[in-house]
Amino acid sequence: MELKNLHGRKARMLLVYPDYTDRDCARKMSGGNYSEGLASISAVLKQGGHHVELLHLLNLHTEEDFKKRLREKGEFDIIGFSIRTTAFPDCQNYIKWTKEVYPDVFIICGSYHCTLVPDEVLAVDGVDCVCVGDGEYPELELCDKMTAGEDYTDTKSLYFKNDD
């Protein structure tokens, strides 16, 4: 795995939140659910000087719709997927489509499914890293080390494709 080096520039991260449990639902009627985990990650990264945005998915997206929303958000160094077990099949598609739009983006996955079965998530094509457990400080360390051009593969709670 080639390490991502931001050459002193703070990281730009997009957090993707598939906020639906029923794959057949047309659309959530409300504004969706609040994710304390993603809010905490966003706050810690922003306090560290990094740029963070959210792509809040309130319903299952087609390839065309997902890619359109992704492009509308702009370009990022890192895209993080919050993966519950019920959303894992959809996230596999979202990750594939993300890599088709931004082939060089670094993809990190976290949340419940990643903590329960990290090897299954890490085996998905396009996934660079999986966070097991709370992600605020491991992801801050990841972003800081990318900014500094340092090796980040020893960051606690993060597992990479080349790990045994």
Predicted regions, residues:
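Glycine-rich beta-alpha loop elements in corrinoid/cobalamin-binding modules
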Residues: 44-164
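A structure-centric signal for secondary-structure junctions around beta-strands
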Residues: 10, 35, 154-155
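Short polar catalytic/cofactor-binding loops
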Residues: 17-22
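Short boundary motifs at domain starts and secondary-structure transition points
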Residues: 1-9, 70
